[in-house]
C-alpha cells in the first residue's frame, strides 16, 4: 500500500504474524488448514515435511507464531463451578523425585464443570505453587462469585476475600484419590499429558510451554465444532490481529529462563 500524500509505503500483512515473511501467504494458509484439520495438531518436523519447507527452524517458528494467535487477550473468564489443580509436565532429571521435579513445568489447570461434563478450560505455566501465583491465575481465569473447588493446598487460601466461593477436598498421595475426588480437572490433565507425549514426544520445553498450552486450550475449547473450516477461519482471524514476533523474540524466553527452575509445592 502506498500513500500518495506522504509517500509512506506499507503492506497488508504489516502488524500481523505474517509480517516480513519471505514465503507466500498461500503456504501459510496451507499450514493453518493442516494444523486445524488434524485432531491432535502436528509437530514442527511434521509441518516441515507436509509443506516441503527447507528449514526445520521455519516450521518451528511458524508453529509458535500460530500458537501465539490461538488465544485472544481479554477472552471471557470461566464461571459457575470450576475445578482447579496443578500438575507437572515435561522432562525429568535423574536423581530428583518427590516435590522437586527438575526440568518439569508446573502447570495449573482450571476446568468448568457442567453437570457430569466439562465446559471450557484455562491453563497456565507457573513458577511456583505460592498464593501469589495461584491467586493471580484464578483472578485472571475465573469470574468472581464462581465456586472454586481445589485440593486444599495452602496456596489457595484467601480466595474468599476475592469474592470466590471456595470448596476444598484434602486428597491423599495416591493419584487415584485425586482422579476420583476431582475427576474433571484430572481428565483434562491426563489428556494434556497424552497430547504432549503423543504429538510432541514430550519435547515441549519449559521456556515455551505457554505456547503449547495455548494450542491445547484452543483445540479443547473447540472440540465440539463439527466444521474444520470454522477453526481455520478463527485462527486466520486471530492471526491478522496478533502482533508480529520475530524469530529472535520467540527464542528469547529460552535464554532468559534456562537457569531458573519451578519451585514445586504441594502438587501431585
List each language-model region with its residue ranges.
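Residue-level recognition of single "structural anchor" positions
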Residues: 1-268
